[in-house]
Structures are given as structure tokens and as C-alpha cells.
Amino acid sequence: EEKAKSQALDLDDMGACLPAKVVIRSGSYEDLDDADILVNAIGRSRKEGETRLDMFGDSMERLKDIIPKIQDTKFRGILISITNPADVVGECLRKALGIERFRCFSTGTSLDSLRIKRILEEKTGYHRNSIEAFCMGEHGDSQIVPLSRVSVGGKPFAKLQKEYPDTLGKITIEDLQDEVRQAGMTVIIGKKSTEFGIGIALSGIVKSIVYDEKRIWPLS
């Protein structure tokens, strides 16, 4: 409770720099009664050499005391889970709380889809905002990059590879998939946890819901 208050106070110090009035405070489970969106971030950081699936037991152990407290509220909003393993934990939460699929989901491969754009920008030199690409499947080691759906400035990437065989033509789907799968661990080895990438992905999803943007996100 004290940590929550301190965290809220620390965040609220930036209030004067925000473009609109935002109330940042700590709260209680009773606040969920009329909440529109609940984000589950319970869990620990992934350890070096550990897969996301290896974290399942610890994640659910931490959630077992939280789930009944949510059940005791009148929460009828949308629950977004970012706890790893994201896809599995999100589904377990949905079943435990008896929430419809459209009201309870994880961030899926949203973060991975941001990462593949960064990787392609580094490899091709094109700005990532001109690159259309996304990851499918599990947020983990089995995710895939559908190369047939990758384009740069509207031009299929496969066509660009044929036009530039000595540069873009040397980029393989295997290399792309391996790099995006290892991206999270690369960050963890250097700083012990991932924060900002998943944070911007989550905020984008929340914004899409609040403003009904009709955007498509690869969730699960």
C-alpha cells in the first residue's frame, strides 16, 4: 500500500507537464466497481535463459490471491493482461473470472510487432513508420513473422528483395524470426527487465479502446 502511494506521488509530479489534467492516485479494489479498464501486470521479471512459459507457475501463484479480490468487486470493464506468459495467463484470468473474450485478453504479439518494425528498419534503412509488418501466434518462442505480409511504402518486401538482391535479398525470414524472438532476452541480459516497449504497446491498446479508433492489434 505504501509503495502504491509513493509510486502514484512520483508519477503525479509530472502532472504540470501533461497537456491535460490527469488524476494519478493509489486506490483499492473497490475502485474496480466502476472502472473501464483494468491492467494486470502482476509478476516478476524474466530471468536470463528463462522462457516466458517457465514463468507460468510463479505468475499464477501471485495471481491466486488477486483473482478472488477482483471477483468480489462489481468490475464490468475490460481487463488487459501483460503478465508473462501473456497468452496463457490472459486465458487463465478470463476463465477464472468468467469474462467474455472481448473483455479479457493479453497484449499478444503487439510488442513483437513493434520489434519487427524496428529490426526491419535497422536492416533496410527505411523508416519503421513506412514499414507494414506484424507477428502472429504466441508472444514467445513460437511466434512467426508472415513475410508475405511485410511491405515497405506499400511495396511487398519480397519484391524489394528481388530488386535489391545484394542487400535486402540477403535478409531471411529465419533471421528475422530469430531476432524478434530473442529481442526480449537481449534487453533482459542488459537491464534485467523490459519496460518501455510493452508500456507503449499497452498505452496504444488502451487509447484505441477509449477513443474507439477501430485499429487492429494482434492480441490474444
Go through each PLM region and give its residues.
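Conserved N-terminal Rossmann-fold NAD(P) cofactor-binding segment
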Residues: 2-35, 50
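N-terminal glycine-rich phosphate/adenylate-binding segment common to multiple enzyme folds
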Residues: 46-48
